[in-house]
Amino acid sequence: MPVGGMRIIDRIITVMRPIFDELIVVTNIPSAYQGLDVTFTNDTFTTRCSMTGLHAGLKAIKNKKAFVVGCDAPFIKTEMIKALLRFDHPDVDVTVPSTQAGLEPLFAIYSRSCLNIIAQHLLQGRYKVSDVYSRLRVKTVDERYLRKADPDLISFFNVNTPDLISKAETISLRMDTQA
């Protein structure tokens, strides 16, 4: 899906490529993303949701941890990712932003050690990502620190409704004008 003339997945990869040595896209239709220099994996559970995507992505990583972002976030910022990485610690399973709107589980750092607990939740039909947090070591990062990297927290904006897609186009035009 394009925003500002560029597919969201391409926007995300452009930001993440200089930061990470391993990029994984969870999709059941890899042909839709031909030409991308990424590793593809697919869901191992039949239910399609963020939690199954998280599980598949963590299962595919070679590293101990992964930065995870939803593929509907067109405005992620390098500075925001780096800010979150600075707060991550080897002794935590999840490093997640916390804002007035709540937690941002689809813009977070996850350890491979989360896999079993995520799988248990999926097998129980529990699909909300943040529900696993009570069974994990979680580090929350307050928005006052994150706003230093992304004052408007635009990195958390996602486009999962037609109205939000329209709003994203407006934001993209504004950002292009300011650049």
Role assignments for model-derived ranges:
Residues 1-126, 131-153, 169-176:
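Nucleotide and nucleotide-moiety/phosphate-recognizing core
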Residues 156-159:
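Conserved anion/nucleotide-ligand pocket segment
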